[in-house]
């Protein structure tokens, strides 16, 4: 789980358009992965049953319960929390709830990693004061909106395999939302069509990430 280090900028215009229809996919299994970050740690738990509250520069209170979680924060530090699956898939992800930002930068996204190649990926559904996401590669239309596709390289940064150099693949929705269905397969196919290939999927979560501000979110995931 890596934060973006670039200065905050306005999203660039879309350069390429790819439209991929949704497909009927099997339902997902129950949640079996809880993600929290305190400074640079990646923490995995088989059962979503814990609370995070750290005060280095501020407060983050994270409370998962079954397939739902709440998070309240007021901090200058980075945090990332999420709920999902130990192994990602192309199955659709349903999410519903709230995402309110008083100040600072925050993202509500589908978030995960792949290995071989090592890739960190985001499907950003809502955001506040978003940073630059790298280089615009194209776009994809899915779930009632266009998404700008970005690619970014991280050099000697923390990852799920330790300090490494890896790419980030990022889809950013043009009409933000706090609830809906994300057809993950559409994004994976659009990335692949642009030469942005994923490897073996590692964990995959609905994540709230924030830094330098305050806000609150409540989400249910399936």
UniProtKB/Swiss-Prot annotation:
Pathway: Glycan degradation; xylan degradation. Keywords: Carbohydrate metabolism, Glycoprotein, Glycosidase, Hydrolase, Polysaccharide degradation, Signal, Xylan degradation. SUPFAM superfamilies: Concanavalin A-like lectins/glucanases. It holds the Pfam family Glyco_hydro_11. It is an enzyme of class 3 (hydrolase). GO terms for molecular function: endo-1,4-beta-xylanase activity. It catalyses: Endohydrolysis of (1->4)-beta-D-xylosidic linkages in xylans. Endo-1,4-beta-xylanase involved in the hydrolysis of xylan, a major structural heterogeneous polysaccharide found in plant biomass representing the second most abundant polysaccharide in the biosphere, after cellulose. May act as an elicitor of plant defense responses in certain plants but does not exhibit any cell death when transiently expressed in N.benthamiana. This is Ethylene-inducing xylanase 2. The lineage of its organism: Eukaryota, Fungi, Dikarya, Ascomycota, Pezizomycotina. The gene is EIX2.
């Amino acid at each position: 789980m890596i934060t973006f280090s670039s200065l905050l900028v306005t999203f660039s215009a879309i350069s390429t358009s790819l439209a991929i229809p949704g497909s009927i996919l099997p339902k997902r299994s129950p949640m079996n992965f809880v993600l929290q970050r305190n400074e640079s740690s990646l923490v995995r738990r088989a059962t979503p049953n814990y609370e995070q509250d750290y005060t280095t520069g501020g407060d983050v209170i994270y409370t998962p319960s079954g397939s739902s979680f709440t998070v309240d924060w007021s901090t200058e530090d980075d945090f990332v929390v999420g709920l999902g699956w130990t192994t990602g898939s192309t199955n659709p992800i349903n999410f519903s709830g709230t995402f309110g930002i008083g100040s600072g930068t925050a993202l509500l996204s589908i978030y995960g990693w792949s290995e071989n190649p090592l890739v960190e990926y985001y499907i950003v559904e809502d955001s506040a004061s978003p940073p630059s996401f790298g280089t615009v590669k194209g776009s994809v239309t899915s779930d009632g909106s266009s998404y700008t596709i970005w690619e970014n390289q991280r050099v000697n940064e923390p990852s799920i395999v330790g300090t490494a150099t890896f790419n980030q693949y990022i889809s950013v929705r043009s009409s933000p939302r706090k609830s809906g269905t994300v057809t993950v397969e559409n994004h994976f196919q659009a990335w692949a069509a642009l030469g942005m290939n994923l490897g073996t999927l590692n964990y995959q979560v609905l994540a709230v990430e924030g830094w330098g501000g305050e806000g609150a979110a409540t989400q249910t995931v399936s």
